[in-house]
A protein has these predicted regions:
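Active-site and NAD+-binding cores of ADP-ribose-processing enzymes
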Residues: 2-16, 29, 57-154
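NAD-dependent ADP-ribosyltransferases
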Residues: 15-28, 35
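Extended catalytic/binding region for NAD+/ADP-ribose chemistry, centered on the ART fold
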Residues: 27-47, 51, 123-127
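Short proline/glycine-enriched turn/loop segments at secondary-structure junctions
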Residues: 53-55
Length: 154
């Protein structure tokens, strides 16, 4: 399986989970390293756009393609098991992710996207023994269409 993420070109050649460990994220509190990825390039793009400040900021990013072999174990947080309006409650989602990641039972945690609930993000646990089987396939520049930043009249 190939998964995708955008990262600053300074860090696009490494898989460490340091950024999420330092800052926390949707599914992890600070202190727990994790590498956030998405099942498609378009979902990875939506995830990064939700947090981007400007087109100039995006132009510093590269698209990473990460190869996860089929032998890697996976655990899933299912949408139907989450409480109503879970996507507004960072404490709740961080607790859910922490429960899985801290036990170190799996190298891969499948979670619903808070933006597109029917699609999935994959959290890679760099502390799991099977992490060594996961490989960075490529890191390439990505063209972010300027229309993404035009003011919309809706």
């Amino acid at each position: 399986m190939i998964v995708y993420r955008f990262a600053h070109r300074k860090f696009a050649s490494e898989l460490s989970g340091t950024g999420a460990r330092l800052n926390g994220g949707r599914w992890n509190p600070p202190g727990i390293p994790v590498i956030y990825t998405s099942e498609s390039i378009s979902l990875a793009l939506l995830e990064v756009l939700a947090n981007a400040g400007s087109l100039q900021e995006l132009q510093l990013l590269q698209l990473m393609e990460i190869d996860i072999p089929n032998i890697a174990g996976k655990q899933e947080i299912k949408l139907l098991n989450l409480k109503k309006n879970w996507f507004y409650d960072f404490d709740y989602t961080q607790w859910m992710g922490q429960e899985v990641l801290q036990t170190n039972k799996t190298v891969l945690l499948q979670c619903p996207s808070a933006i597109v609930h029917q699609e999935h993000n994959y959290l890679i646990n760099p502390l799991h023994p099977d992490f060594k089987k996961i490989k960075l396939h490529t890191s390439t520049d990505f063209y972010f269409d300027e229309r993404l930043f035009k003011q919309q009249k809706i």
